[in-house]
Amino acid sequence: MIEYIRGELAALTPAQAVIEAAGVGYALGISLNTYTVLQGKREVKLYVHEAIVTGGRDDSYTLYGFATVQERALYRLLITVSGVGAN
């Protein structure tokens, strides 16, 4: 598992951050809270949640980034609720 990614912020939108680390650009879905924290920064560190979906035609591997460990923990708690997901 990926615990966190630290690197240069290559691109930022309210829904996504791209972090370049060791020559690889990682696209991570982010919250508006994390977006606010990242604005104006060059070097960043995001705590990662990996979402792997298999078993159908649309298998996917998605990364979500959070500004703090606490925000990631809250997200992980929320997705345990039936009917709640990343979108």
Language-model region placement:
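Long, highly charged, low-complexity intrinsically disordered interaction regions
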Residues: A11-N87
